[in-house]
Design a protein with these regions (language model features):
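Substrate-binding beta-hairpin/strand module that engages nucleic acids
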Residues: 179-201
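Acidic, low-complexity intrinsically disordered tails
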Residues: 1-20, 194-201
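A non-catalytic, helix-rich entry segment at domain boundaries
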Residues: 11-117
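Short coil/turn segments at beta-strand junctions that form active-site/ligand-binding loops
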Residues: 103, 134-136, 181-183
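Non-catalytic protein-protein interaction segments used by genome-maintenance enzymes to assemble
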Residues: 5-11, 28-35, 114-169, 173-178
Length: 201
């Protein structure tokens, strides 16, 4: 799923001083949404392009317009989407993740499962596939986040791992019924770009 969903980080009755942060959160959410769409579409191609193409840029711009963006916000979000996808296409790990050659590969894979307590849960896995070389199943969650001002890479990865380890653990439990293969879970940060594996208990 796309980043930036914590609307609860914005007060219920924000004052004027909160508005820039609210706009920033909205742009980050929309960038994440369109990056997810772009990576899904690329993963369905028989072969990955070496570069972002003009048709792709126009399609992503239209997706952002449909989300309600225009003017400077549209230009800023469009540039962020294009840069994230460029970085993924230029990254060997990104190209490996997006390759259509993996068996049992799915993007934006929708599942419905029951928790141990019987609660029904819907989930969408950004990318999953079997790695033929290792025989392992990968579950990968895309993130467009980057370290904050003054935040080290180690601090950033620790924070993101803590935030999403429960979500990835749920994905792993749901996917375990598909076969006996070992399952590895990771976050892929498109803006860095970096594949960061999570060690889940």
């Amino acid at each position: 799923p796309a980043d930036g969903e914590p609307d609860q980080a914005v007060p219920q009755n924000p004052g004027e001083n909160n508005i820039p942060q609210r706009v920033s959160n909205r742009l980050e959410r929309y960038v994440g949404t369109v990056v997810h769409l772009a990576l899904e579409e690329l993963s369905l191609r028989d072969s990955l392009p070496e570069h972002v193409e003009d048709d792709d840029l126009r399609r992503w711009e239209m997706a952002l317009r449909r989300l309600g963006l225009g003017g400077q916000d549209l230009a800023q979000a469009g540039a962020a989407v294009a840069q994230s996808v460029r970085d993924a296409l230029h990254d060997p790990q990104g190209r490996w993740i997006l390759s259509a050659r993996h068996p049992e590969a799915h993007s934006e894979y929708a599942l419905t499962c029951a928790d141990p307590d019987g609660k029904i849960r819907d989930m969408v896995i950004d990318r999953t596939f079997l790695d033929l070389e290792s025989g392992e199943r990968w579950i990968i969650d895309y993130k467009t986040a980057r370290p904050g001002d003054g935040e080290s890479m180690a601090e950033f990865l620790q924070r993101e791992s803590h935030a999403y380890s429960g979500q990835l653990l749920g994905y792993r439990q749901a996917m375990a019924v598909l076969g006996p293969q070992p399952i590895r879970c990771a976050l892929y940060f498109t803006a860095l770009p970096l594949l960061h594996e999570l060690k889940l208990e």
